[in-house]
Amino acid sequence: MRIILRLKLAVCCFVVLALPFRIQGQETVNPGTVLPDDSVALENQVRNSKFNTVLPQVMRDNEIDMWIHVMRPWTPDPLNFEFGSDMGIFIFTDRGEDRIERAIFAGHVSDRNAYNIISRPRVQLPTFVDGVITEQPGGDETDYLKFRFDGVREFVAERDPDRIGVNYAEALGLSAASEHAPLTDGLSHTDYTLLLNALGDKYAKRVVSAEHLILDYLAGRVPEEIELYRQFGLITADSLDREFGKVVPGVTSLSDLEGNVFRRNPDGVEFHAQDREPYILQPGDVFTILHGAGNRIFSSDLGGNAYLLREGETEAPPEIQNVWRAALETRQILLANIVAGRTAGQTLDLLIQKIEAAGYHYNPVDQYDSTADPDLTQVHLDVHAVGRSGLVAPRISPLGSDWEREMTIPVLHTFTFEYMIHMPVPAWGPGKHIYIAFHDGAVVTEDGVIIPYPPDPGIRLIR
């Protein structure tokens, strides 16, 4: 068995970024030296870079003078990593300078140098026995919760903000935005009431939802993350080569391979590695592997496709060559038309126009459309964000909620060229088609899209 990487009709160049890693007052770390260890120093560096660059931008874009984020112990919060903590009252104030003032009340942080003000950093927590509070510092639970807000009113009054963003959802449907944690609606009713009481009537009236600010902050990236994205992408590319190299036609099943492994037959029936009776790959099959690599700081993923040569074949048959051409043309359309500053929804509309102008049928569903023109190859898009938080927005896709399409694509947006090609093969019969899927990594810069690590290089030919 050998793999022939011959079907490379054209492959877009990938760009290796030369990125600075300097944070004033902090020890800097080369991400390439710490990937196996999940370096705490690198975590702190990423956190400080976001505080220095992303935080001022998103607060001013959303016209928020002060951002108060209440994080209660024992409650998952999407900003645990971003703030370096799992408890506290975090207050970020725009005082008209380049650097946003950062303060925390009644909480602890992993990197004290990241904050200007730390008030009561060590708060004694209740004692639990079998899940029941047996000893409560300061009295009953209400007293303890209220204690966390001591000093907040005076702190806020001294800064006199006009608009105070707080972590509760107001207009957006966010339940499906993250697999692991609530996104912007992490504030309990009790803490909301305690916060308003602590602020007093004057400043309580200035409170607004920080939902858009939080989403923009989670979507923001810094150069250190882009470098990790690149390095994990290279690791993923090696993993794909390894898995495709295992395939022996007629012997290897989908479940023998690592990653998200699947195949669709000419009727669109999908087979998965997790099937009770895993499919055994045969000559003439086309299949896909999606793989990934990462740590708690960042992650990357990549997809690859392969064709198993039939007996007597020495190269890909015409239909395989044609579906790869369609994939490359679609990739070039994405590269040429995704830019920062436009919303994901506006970008989706533009891509649909370009795809259809190129002679393809845009399909909003990842299933072959039997009612479409049988002479047109069908393209489906789910170009979503990739990163650490689980946030998939901004999302250039018909899938998901409207707010995911309403988000503006920021500079250094990390995302995946996830798109699918359904190419009809009339010679095989009505509705028969070939399916391939892509999951290339990409970054939006001020100058357009770059590919930080090699994309799918071509349909691998396996004999």
Tell where the protein language model's regions lie, with residue ranges.
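N-terminal secretory signal peptides that target proteins for export/translocation
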Residues: M1-L5
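Bacterial N-terminal signal peptides
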Residues: K8-R22
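Active-site neighborhoods and metal-handling regions in enzymes and metal-associated proteins
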Residues: Q26-R463
